[in-house]
């Protein structure tokens, strides 16, 4: 069954005409990303050549996807909007709350028991408001979306930063916070800064141990975690043909680690085949009828530098297997360099655990190719040194892989098969270790490797690679093992090599599944009652944030001056805290607990200016709030890098933090702060960061004249009585300033 088929038929009936109108209006050829963007303007009469990276534009996405950890807050906000049903097709996916422990057979029932209150809430809200519901065990949101919902030329938003995964099938798919999702769910315009365009020219063909994952790992080394901010990466070139749709999805998925708005590949024969193999023949045919406009125009491909803001050249034939890390996904290292780099940087060289899965690499093809390496270990008599853990991407993939013997290949080398869920990738991992603070190394096929993320241990050195390389390094038990050149010993002491990975792109017998775990939206469920217990510690109805009082912010104590990387994991930790994602008061206790205090180098230990004691960040914030005092956070570059979790914006707002002053922001987090009525400001001169002292009282003036492109003034009142003043800037437009004045975007929408 093709889901939402009437919406898809209507879309394709007008898509090519919309693109033609766009070309006629802007009077030039278009890139593929531009075609999709222009075809989704909220008001087509406003079509014009927008300034990339500068102007905000209103769009009308086709659909919304939400995962269970972020859906709670998004749907709590939606329930306050007074709507009878969602305005566009939407889905909820229960994948983040399932803890990986001993294996799927026991872990899934335990998760259903532990999270029953949340699952019941999400299921009832989905039924009441006409939202598709994918229950626990159904699969990871982005793999399920690719298999069932993604379509060439479409636009979607998702309350998860790896939503761009659907770009592998030709969508502009953007990760957003819950408040942005509510805009789309209620039929309002969805605002986005017109992205810059980075063209990635692929030539050659991957071979040997090189995989699509290595393509994006190499690009991360080139562009870094900030290089894609406010940009779409559009892939083109002859190299496209050799990469499968799921491989392209992997590349788009980790574009999120570049800070990119999204990434996109054009429609091609591989995409058509993927649609047909996943039971969507009609969509493949509709896309084929529009194929000329599901790619960049010929003139663009002939002279790409005239149409893209930046060009990145990648020769696939020269791509090597990579290991990126530790602690940041842009620390790119070809595996051939690890023998020198590892000891030079004092990396722990023994690989204790290898983890294959996540929304980035859990397709049938990923598992089939990884299994071809596992199979060699037992066929060639090689002792496996590390522990291997597998998370299939969906129930359809798990069922098919089990039927085809793929899971048996993993089990024969001692692998644990976990639930079709995120698990360790989002910190939902009960790691069995005698000391979860010791220095050690793990290798994953995941997307992020921030300190503490997988297992809570700050001394776990996590490296990211392909599923194939992950299995090879787990077998070898060494971080510096290069499967293309190095040998291993079999049980007789003979030197043997691992052959390059092989595996089918699609299952030869086709995909199969008994129960996908899906409950379709139905008009019959409109009278379903949604119950939230007032005594719940996991769910809490939202109260509106207070509007701006019309005054400047004066004498704010510094809550924390963070040093170095401060991701959304540092601001609102996941793992054991995921259970509170529907309860703002409770989850606010983790505010900035992972951030490093610039004045003492410690995490979650800041000075409470009211009594001079050093306490947890949330404790200090609550003390200020109890006295009616607003506070401020000061940070360095790319503040809020990482996931789309709006809790990282709602928590400081709830605890009366009014300002985040940073050297720069990650795109999604900056938007989330604006949506919640906070002030996200940047230093005009980054060196002014160094002027901020631990005991400062900080004032922000000029708010009565707050306007687009205006400057505000920060005054630091130091403990010794001296002062420093400097200007700060912002990216707020008129609408976003209205959100601030109303107290939040939701407050503003409610007044309209």
Please place each PLM-identified region on the residue numbering.
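Non-catalytic terminal/interface segments that mediate subunit docking, oligomerization
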Residues: 76-80, 305-401, 405, 524-659
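Acidic, glycine-rich flexible loop/linker segments
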Residues: 488-505, 670-739, 746-749
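Long, structured ligand/cofactor-binding scaffold of large enzymes
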Residues: 8-11, 15, 20-195, 581-633, ...
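Terminal amphipathic helices with adjacent charged low-complexity linkers/tails
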Residues: 42, 46, 51-60, 74, ...
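Mobile "lid/hinge" segments at catalytic clefts and subdomain interfaces of large enzymes
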Residues: 3-4, 68, 151-284, 416, ...
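Short glycine/threonine-rich loop-to-helix capping motif typified by GTGT followed
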Residues: 47, 147, 151, 243-249, ...
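Extended C-terminal subregions enriched in glycine
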Residues: 379-429, 435, 643, 649, ...
């Amino acid at each position: 069954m093709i889901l939402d088929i009437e919406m898809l038929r209507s879309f394709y009936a007008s898509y090519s005409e919309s693109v033609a109108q766009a070309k006629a209006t802007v009077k030039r050829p278009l890139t593929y990303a531009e075609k999709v963007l222009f075809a989704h303007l909220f008001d087509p009469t406003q079509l014009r050549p927008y300034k990339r990276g500068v102007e905000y534009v209103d769009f009308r996405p086709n659909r919304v996807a939400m995962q269970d950890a972020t859906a709670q807050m998004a749907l709590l906000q939606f329930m306050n909007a007074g709507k009878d049903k969602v305005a566009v097709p939407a889905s909820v996916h229960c994948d983040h709350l399932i803890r990986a422990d001993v294996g799927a057979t026991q872990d899934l029932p335990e998760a259903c028991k532990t999270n029953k209150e949340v699952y019941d809430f999400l299921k009832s809200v989905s039924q009441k408001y006409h939202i598709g519901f994918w229950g626990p065990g159904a699969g990871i949101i982005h793999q399920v979306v690719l298999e069932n919902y993604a379509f060439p030329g479409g636009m979607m938003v998702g309350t998860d930063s790896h939503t761009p995964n659907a770009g592998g099938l030709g969508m502009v798919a953007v990760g957003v916070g819950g408040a942005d999702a509510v805009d789309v769910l209620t039929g309002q315009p969805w605002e986005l800064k017109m992205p810059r365009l980075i063209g990635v020219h692929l030539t050659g063909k991957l071979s040997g141990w090189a995989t699509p994952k290595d393509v994006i790992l190499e690009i991360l080394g080139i562009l870094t975690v900030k290089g894609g901010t406010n940009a779409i990466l559009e892939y083109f070139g002859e190299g496209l043909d050799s990469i499968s749709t799921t491989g392209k999805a992997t590349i788009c998925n980790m574009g999120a680690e570049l800070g990119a708005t999204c990434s996109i590949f054009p429609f091609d024969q591989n995409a058509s085949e993927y649609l047909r193999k996943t039971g969507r023949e009609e969509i493949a045919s509709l896309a084929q009828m529009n194929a000329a406009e599901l790619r960049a125009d010929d003139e663009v491909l002939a002279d790409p530098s005239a149409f893209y803001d930046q060009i990145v050249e990648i020769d696939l034939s020269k791509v090597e297997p990579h290991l990126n890390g530790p602690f940041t996904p842009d620390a790119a290292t070809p595996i051939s360099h690890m023998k020198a780099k590892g000891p030079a940087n004092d990396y722990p060289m023994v690989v204790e655990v290898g983890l294959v899965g996540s929304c980035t690499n859990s397709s049938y093809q990923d598992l089939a190719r990884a299994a071809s390496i596992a199979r060699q270990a037992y066929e060639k008599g090689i002792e496996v040194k590390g522990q291997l853990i597998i998370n299939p991407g969906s129930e359809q993939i798990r069922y098919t892989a089990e039927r085809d013997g793929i899971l048996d290949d993993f089990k024969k080398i001692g692998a644990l098969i976990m639930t079709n869920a995120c698990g360790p990738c989002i910190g939902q991992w009960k790691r069995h270790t005698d000391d979860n603070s010791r220095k050690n190394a793990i290798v994953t096929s995941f997307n992020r490797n921030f300190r503490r993320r997988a297992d809570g241990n700050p001394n776990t050195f996590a490296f990211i690679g392909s599923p194939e390389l992950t299995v090879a390094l787990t077998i070898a038990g060494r971080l510096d093992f290069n499967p293309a050149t190095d040998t291993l010993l079999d049980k007789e002491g003979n030197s043997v090599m691992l052959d390059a990975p092989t595996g089918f792109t699609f299952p030869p017998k086709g995909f199969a599944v008994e129960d996908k775990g899906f409950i379709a939206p139905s008009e019959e469920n409109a009278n379903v009652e949604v119950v939230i217990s007032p005594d719940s510690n996991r769910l809490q109805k939202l109260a509106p944030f207070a509007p701006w009082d019309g005054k400047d912010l004066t004498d704010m104590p510094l809550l924390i001056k963070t040093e170095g990387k401060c991701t959304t994991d540092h601001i609102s930790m996941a793992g054991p805290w995921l259970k509170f994602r529907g309860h703002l008061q409770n989850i606010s206790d983790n505010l900035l607990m992972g951030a490093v205090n610039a004045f003492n180098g410690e995490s979650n230990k800041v000075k409470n200016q009211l009594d001079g004691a050093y306490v947890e960040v949330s404790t200090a914030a609550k003390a200020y709030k109890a006295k009616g005092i607003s506070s401020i956070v000061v940070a360095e570059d790319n503040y809020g890098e990482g996931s789309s979790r709006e809790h990282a914006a709602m928590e400081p707002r709830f605890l009366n933090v009014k300002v985040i002053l940073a050297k720069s922001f990650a795109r999604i987090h900056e938007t989330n702060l604006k949506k919640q009525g906070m002030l996200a400001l940047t230093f005009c001169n980054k060196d002014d960061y160094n002027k901020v002292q631990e005991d400062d009282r900080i004032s922000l003036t000029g708010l009565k004249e707050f306007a687009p492109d205006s400057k505000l003034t920060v005054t630091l009142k130091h403990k010794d009585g001296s002062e420093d003043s400097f200007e700060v800037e912002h990216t707020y437009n008129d609408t976003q300033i209205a959100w601030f004045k109303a107290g939040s975007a939701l407050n503003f929408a409610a007044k309209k």
